[in-house]
Regions:
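P-loop NTPase motor domains
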Residues: 1-122, 138, 185-197
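A broad, structure-centric signal for solvent-exposed, well-ordered loop/edge residues
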Residues: 62, 160, 211-213
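Short, solvent-exposed amphipathic alpha-helical segments in soluble enzyme
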Residues: 68-71, 168-170, 210
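Active/binding-pocket-proximal capping segment
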Residues: 87-89, 95, 134, 144-147, ...
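Short alpha-helix boundary/capping motifs
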Residues: 98, 148-149, 208-209
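Conserved ATP-driven motor cores of ASCE-family P-loop NTPases powering translocation/secretion/packaging/pilus
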Residues: 114-203
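Charge-patterned, long linear interaction tracts outside catalytic cores
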Residues: 201-217
Length: 217
């Protein structure tokens, strides 16, 4: 990044003082990215196993910058990697992105996030958007629900009947809607209702993190 920044800063023909300059200055001041090219790897090389990008502690504008750059890099390298392998009706899963508190990013309307959601399957890339409320998926002009085929719904504190219609495609004020509404409100910890495509909802007992830990040890 230092090479890019220095070339940009020392080029008098490039107009300064705009939003791009402000973004580069912040990334440079906070030393977000590695400055030494020999110490860097491609994003896909780093994504081996579980990799957590912790953005807590940064201002929201810096978080948005990092997310936008990371998503753009991921998308370009995803396409360069080519289509994933097929085995019968099943496609190889190569990468899985989990976005926690996804409403913070969905509200930004990142174009690349939508591209990954829309095109990722061909490249074996799955995406999980985790958020507290169902309304976050369809607010404003950004309707993320059209890119989602699988829903895993836990207990929702401010659930509305319209949310049930939105996810489960039930008719408003129908008996099915009310049954699902009551079921979701009554879900206990580590229990969920799963909706896959056009299939009927399935009640699931989730495997808790401590159960996975016990199995591993």
């Amino acid at each position: 990044f230092d090479q890019v920044y220095n070339r940009y800063a020392n080029d008098d023909e490039i107009k300064k003082g705009d939003s791009l300059a402000a973004a580069l200055d912040k990334l440079h001041i906070f030393q977000i990215f590695e400055g030494n090219p020999s110490a860097t790897k491609s994003l896909f090389e780093i994504l081996n196993g579980v990799v957590v990008i912790d953005l807590s502690g940064y201002d929201s504008d810096i978080q948005s910058l990092i997310v936008a750059i990371t998503l753009d890099l991921f998308y370009s390298q995803m396409q360069a990697s080519g289509s994933s392998k097929m085995e019968g009706n099943y496609r190889q899963l190569t990468k899985l992105i989990l976005v926690d508190e996804a409403d913070n990013f969905m509200s930004e309307g990142f174009p690349t996030l939508k591209k990954i959601l829309k095109e990722g399957r061909e490249f074996g890339v799955g995406t999980i958007l985790s958020t507290q409320f169902l309304k976050h998926f369809g607010s404003g002009d950004d309707d993320y629900s059209k890119y989602i085929l699988t829903w895993v719904v836990h207990n929702v504190s401010d659930l509305k009947n319209s949310d049930v219609d939105f996810v489960f495609k039930t008719e408003a004020k129908s008996q099915e809607n009310q049954v699902l509404f009551n079921a979701i409100k009554g879900l206990t910890k580590h229990h969920s209702i799963v909706k896959i495509g056009n299939n009927k909802p399935v009640y699931v007992q989730d495997k808790a993190f401590w159960e996975l830990y016990q199995e591993a040890h």
